[in-house]
């Protein structure tokens, strides 16, 4: 009778069956292990001798491809511990020795300082009010001391809350501050865009606006001078004489809005030149009024104010419309004055030469005159 030998499966075959019968596509299906001849080896083991446990440990290590950084899948780390002399398996037992928990809380002094600051801010208005009324711990009755006790209890509660919930309310304050900063940033950007749009619009109509404002200021000054003339408005001489300066400042403000920043320096230089011309015109008007003051129906400061106002604003508008007019006018005036002074100097020099020549003729000796007559 033939002996029937049933194929036996190794523990590795049973383990593979547990793992959903995974088949390696490179090595094919799992072969059966024949315990009689030992020719068929356990699955996926190369040169495995079951009699040598050392070689079996090496083969198992190769089977799972262990290295020092990985652990075998589907195994508990604490259940499978295989050691080998030549091939070091991974250390599956890991011990976490914590040196100590890190304390994220704020330092004691900072926590105390910030918590105490809230009490100061809470009590400062009341203390300032009592000091202002001069009633700080003076003539206190039962009601006043009751209020003081309630106030102290409230301060103690606030301090305790600030101390115990320090991390919470400081985080809330930080979030609130960041939110407010973002709101301010967005608002500032929106306002900047609005101002830019308005500035571009004003710059496009700057000439019309300058003329309109100049006409309105002219009407206001005429009404002002009319009221002063009729006696219904009593203004001193300094205010009337500074009308041109007020108008120049008004135009400077308007020009700083209507004119871009890169042309503001030109506006400032033009205004300074206008004010210089104001001074010259004021001197001329005062000189004329001192000579012919009796022939003017208006008082002198009214005439001076009108002249300065019209000339100043006319020159300022002209400078805004045609840059460099005042500079050319200054150069022209300087050339004219130089020409006049040069002519006067030449005339004076000619007169001096004529007088000097006459004196030289008078100094000629009589002997020379006789020689000249004989010749």
Curated annotation (Swiss-Prot):
Gene Ontology terms: cellular component: ascus epiplasm; endoplasmic reticulum; membrane; vacuole
Keyword list, A-Z: Cytoplasm, Endoplasmic reticulum, Membrane, Toxin, Transmembrane, Transmembrane helix, Vacuole
Signal peptide: none
Annotated Basic and acidic residues bias: 11-29
Keyword Endoplasmic reticulum set for record: yes
Residues covered by region (Disordered): 1-42, 74-103
Changes seen on gene knockout: Abnormal spore maturation in presence of cw27-encoded poison. Sensitises cells to cw27-encoded poison; simultaneous disruption of cw9 enhances sensitivity.
Family matches, as InterPro entries: WTF (IPR004982)
GO biological processes: meiotic drive
Chain ranges passing through the membrane: 108-128, 145-165, 172-192, 208-228, 245-265, 272-292, 336-356
Assembly notes: Homomer. Forms protein aggregates. The two isoforms can interact with each other and with themselves. High sequence similarity is required for their interaction.
Biological role stated in the UniProt entry: Promotes unequal transmission of alleles from the parental zygote to progeny spores by acting as poison/antidote system where the poison and antidote proteins are produced from the same locus; the poison component is trans-acting and targets all spores within an ascus whereas the antidote component is spore-specific, leading to poisoning of all progeny that do not inherit the allele.
Family: Belongs to the WTF family.
Protein name (database record): Meiotic driver cw27
Organism: Schizosaccharomyces pombe
